[in-house]
């Protein structure tokens, strides 16, 4: 075992990805649940941290209350912690609120990453920064607006002008390609602008840093779309869900395991340097709308209910939307079953009207192509790869449906007991 010690700082540790990173520590070769404890004696000034005794990797996990990235003394705090790697999971994620509070969004999403980048460059530390698919605008908006206009008529075509992904693919017989790192970023919202500014300022200050763009994160932690839909499907007779925004749902624990693989690689390298730098995309494979995502959630939950329920109990079929809507938006697989909840597709504009409040604009199409990152990691020497138990499938490069199934079934949820 190498004698080199690598200290890893996780910022925003109370958030969804931060919790996923900590929950997946036991899957690392260097860790086991019985060896994990919640204090670093060498860094007693930092509470709420974890270390594997006897290993050469130390984890310092801090939430906003423990480490405010917008504070004037950030550099001094970072120097006290003295990390070799910083994983920046902290972010201002209130997309709609950012429209009214751009200063707060810029402070955490743009200025803080730049300050982290400068400190890491000066100290020779590696920075991994998490960004968002919302840095993109309507890359395919005009194209699909024309398609809908030709098929459904001008008025409906204009109304659905930003629809892309599965609906258009069903008509064209050819799904649009996912977005690559070289596609033009034109964020529509102030939140997206703040995230793009953070990427640009960070990489300008520290070209050796790594930016990971991801999309539609969900997990068993915090508040997210899957947990919300899982609850609402049992509470409401009808759910109206946006069908004209297309992206890729991504399991935060799959992203966490990818990051740990990169960190093991960094730790085992003989020289202290970044293993990857620049901007890369990570998401599950495939694409869907929020409406199709909700249908898949309902279907998978219903299957679980059927598998666990006595054979005498019949499942209640899901109520479908109107025929014209269902033809346009429904997946090819059978309608999901859930206790009597009707799932209806609506446009972004219709959903905004239902909320009766202003919404920040969202990209109509933001599915991410992860092939560049996959190729880069395929070149990783096999001895550096973080392994998983042989009977557990690695979730990193799975489809969004397969990742969702793992999350909902509870697989890949290691216990720290």
Task: Please name every model-derived segment.
Residues 6-27, 31:
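N-terminal Rossmann NAD(P)H-binding glycine-rich loop of SDR-like oxidoreductase domains
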Residues 20, 258, 265-315, 319-320, ...:
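Mid/C-terminal beta-alpha module of Rossmann-like enzyme folds, strongest
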Residues 69-108:
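NAD(P)H-binding glycine-rich loop region in Rossmannoid oxidoreductase-like domains
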Residues 79, 100-128:
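NAD(P)-cofactor binding segment of oxidoreductase domains
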Residues 95, 100, 133-153, 161-188:
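Active-site "gating" loop of Rossmann-like NAD(P)-dependent oxidoreductase/epimerase domains
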Residues 100, 107, 111-115, 170-212, ...:
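Catalytic helix-loop patch of NAD(P)-dependent Rossmann-fold dehydrogenases
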Residues 200-248, 253-261:
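NAD(P)-dependent short-chain dehydrogenase/reductase
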Residues 361-417:
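C-terminal amphipathic/interface module of NAD(P)-dependent oxidoreductases
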């Amino acid at each position: 075992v190498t004698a080199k010690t690598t200290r890893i700082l996780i910022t925003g540790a109370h958030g969804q990805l931060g919790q996923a990173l900590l929950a997946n520590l036991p899957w690392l070769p260097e860790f086991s649940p019985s060896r994990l404890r919640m204090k670093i004696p060498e860094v007693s000034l930092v509470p709420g941290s974890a270390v594997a005794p006897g290993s050469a990797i130390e984890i310092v996990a801090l939430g906003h209350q423990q480490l405010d990235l917008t504070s004037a003394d950030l550099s001094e705090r970072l120097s006290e912690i003295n990390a070799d790697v910083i994983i920046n999971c902290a972010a201002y994620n209130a997309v709609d609120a950012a429209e009214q509070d751009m200063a707060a969004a810029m402070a955490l999403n743009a200025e803080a990453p730049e300050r982290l980048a400068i400190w890491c460059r000066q100290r020779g530390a590696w920075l991994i920064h998490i960004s968002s698919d919302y840095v993109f605008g309507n890359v395919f908006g005009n194209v699909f607006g024309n398609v809908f206009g030709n098929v459904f008529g001008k008025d409906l075509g204009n109304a659905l002008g930003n629809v892309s992904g599965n609906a258009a693919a069903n008509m064209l017989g050819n799904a649009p390609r996912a977005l690559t790192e070289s596609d033009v970023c034109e964020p529509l919202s102030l939140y997206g602008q703040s995230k793009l500014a953070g990427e640009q300022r960070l990489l300008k200050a520290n070209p050796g840093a790594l930016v990971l763009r991801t999309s539609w994160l969900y997990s068993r932690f915090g508040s997210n779309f899957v947990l919300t839909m899982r609850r609402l499907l049992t509470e409401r007779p009808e759910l109206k869900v946006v069908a004209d925004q297309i992206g890729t749902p991504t399991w935060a624990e799959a992203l966490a395991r990818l990051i740990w693989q990169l960190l093991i690689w960094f730790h085992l390298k003989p020289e202290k340097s970044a293993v990857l730098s620049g901007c890369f995309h990570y998401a599950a494979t495939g694409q869907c709308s929020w409406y199709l995502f909700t249908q898949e959630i309902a279907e998978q939950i219903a299957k679980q209910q059927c598998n666990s329920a006595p054979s005498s109990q019949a499942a209640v079929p899901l109520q479908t939307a109107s025929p014209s809507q269902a033809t346009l938006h429904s997946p090819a697989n059978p309608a999901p079953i859930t206790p009597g909840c009707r799932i209806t597709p609506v446009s972004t504009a219709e959903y905004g009207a239902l909320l009766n409040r202003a919404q920040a604009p969202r990209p109509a199409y933001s599915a991410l192509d992860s092939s560049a990152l996959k190729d880069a990691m395929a070149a990783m020497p096999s001895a550096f790869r973080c392994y998983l138990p042989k009977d557990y499938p690695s979730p990193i490069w799975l489809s969004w449906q397969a990742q969702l199934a793992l999350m909902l079934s509870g697989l890949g949820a290691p216990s720290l007991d």
